[in-house]
Amino acid sequence: MSTHDDTSAAPSGPRRLKPYQLSIAIGSFMAIFTLMSGVLPLITKWKSDSPIHRQVFEGIPGPIQLAFYTVIPAMLLWGSFRFADRMRNWERGTSDRRRTTAKNAKRRLADFRAGVYMRTLLRDSAAGLMHSMMYFGFLVLLGVTTALELDHQLPESLKFLHGDVYRGYVLIGDLAGLVFTAGVVWAIVRRYIQRPYRIRIKSKPEHAIILGVMLLIGVSGFGAEMFRIAKSTAGGVNMDHEKWSFIGYPLASLVDGWAPRSLELWHQGWWIAHVVAFIAFLAILPITMLRHIFTSPLNMYLKDRDRPKGAMRAMPNLTETSLETFGASVVEDFTWKQLLDTDSCTMCGRCTSVCPAHATGKPLDPR
């Protein structure tokens, strides 16, 4: 009789949803939602009768609208699969128990909030304020765009972006756009003009691409708004309610008197540039350090406080172990949490700037 356990007939329990599958599911949902948000208005044809509102896709040709609702869902799907690839890479690592329990749940939620609010980064007042301007400004802009799209889907009786609500809406949108764009300009100046040591030693070409795309998002947004207001004014539409757009409205006065056709073409050009910039943002999000927007808060949530920060794991007894290699030479030598750490790194250079080995001039770097 065999003394080995026979596991061949062991019942298989319910399959758990893996992290990479969750990424694909979220991306698929967002892609389908975006696609349907383009189809639904074509079927319902619900429009607002209020004179104080904004017509979505005003002056944008149908083929460009079709391209918008085709490319954006495709990019959302693409991004979700690229994130899934990163998560599957984490699964190549060895086990590392990071289970959430009743004992550590409250502490982990506090750590997660600290990651979302960038509490650690705010210790550096300049860098913290700069990143906050970009991060929270972008989130508000995303919320503004989402609110406009939701209003676009609703019947007349439920639409909410009109009257005083719309005035407040454009005020918040311009304020968020100004804060976001100013933050990006500050980041460019800090990285390529002021160039503090810890940033200078970590700058890579992808940083220029990221900042360029983000700057184009901000500038093109104001450009599209500027010419949308100017075009409508030239067409005889009363746009006094757009005075609450304290950036776009004054800019529109700079092109007062231009030919209506020129204003229309400029509006379309800036609108297309804005959408292309956002598509580029979706393209680089999962494949550059921008992914730390998602991975850093997750990493802080999963950090281990049971061991002192930086403490090394004990090595096995070298005379008794059967290991053929020590340390890490291939991906599989790391834990899945260590692989998540690498995808959460923002390449800020703080660890390098305080590393005593690096300070001696030796080619050693914790990053």
Report residues per predicted region:
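Membrane-proximal linker segments that couple transmembrane helices to downstream signaling/catalytic modules
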Residues: E320-K337, A359-T360
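Membrane-embedded alpha-helical bundles of multi-pass integral membrane proteins
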Residues: S2-A328
